């Protein structure tokens, strides 16, 4: 994997990256593991802040489980679960999952807002665009999804993840609010904040929410990916899985499956490696997972790239992290072709 290692070296030397763990696999077989670090080398069990990958590893997967169990329907309105005004009652579960609720990224750090009542604050955010008209990436929408899940199942989100996902998949090192005795790669500027979620909305809510908060490692993420390669088994049935991986926003600016990014010509961060119809997701802290369900190829990238860029530039350079993903995927493509 000389091209991939050369790409990593360039980003480290430029100060855009300190720690990274990459796994390249195909059809359940690991093709390569790459670990690099400016100080202590991470391993396959080192914990990373998964950031928005929480949306697919936890929240949308729990919804697919709920749909599979006939507990909820994609066309259910949010008004079935919480009081809403006339406009917001048009929002469906599908709108929430594919980011078409009309509300973009917003801070929920308000006096009086807390874990128990955050849904009311989300439902009172003014719309940026009409519901269902466009994809606007929405962390508030996924925070609301987390609260709906808790109402549907009668359990807190972290407990639902453990019982319905982590336990069946034997994911032993994936947690919300993990114990500080674990080995982490820090996603925060301050050393004393290691092991604390980076996302400010999730941190404000105590480290557990539908948009972020999960910490995981290469081995556990691989188990999640293997489940996807097995068409959802053992978590959901094949029919539910096939429903989940369709492109629901083809005519909009971003293509979205149920929770997942749907890779097509509009999406750049997978480079030339992944074919149209591949699925995946990114995390703002520097993480990504992508899977080509037809070929069985997958790539997991866990890193501290965003924190490294924040240290160098003082923030505001997520474009560098996005370009890093594109470059790494292209380098992996070259290495696989050379093998």
Predicted regions and their residues:
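Short amphipathic alpha-helical segments
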Residues: 2-9
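Residue-level preference for non-acidic, small/hydrophobic
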Residues: 8, 22, 28, 55, ...
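A short, well-structured edge-of-sheet supersecondary motif
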Residues: 9-42, 98, 110-112, 260-262, ...
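Short, P/G- and charge-enriched loop/turn segments at secondary-structure junctions
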Residues: 9-11, 47, 274-279, 286
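Active-site-proximal loop and beta-strand segments within enzyme catalytic domains
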Residues: 14-18, 26, 40-139, 155
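Short, surface-exposed loop or secondary-structure junction motifs
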Residues: 88-277
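Glycine-rich phosphate/pyrophosphate-binding beta-alpha loops
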Residues: 206-213, 276-291, 303-308
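Short, gly/Ser/Thr-rich active-site loops of penicillin-recognizing serine hydrolases
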Residues: 230, 239-240, 245, 265-268, ...
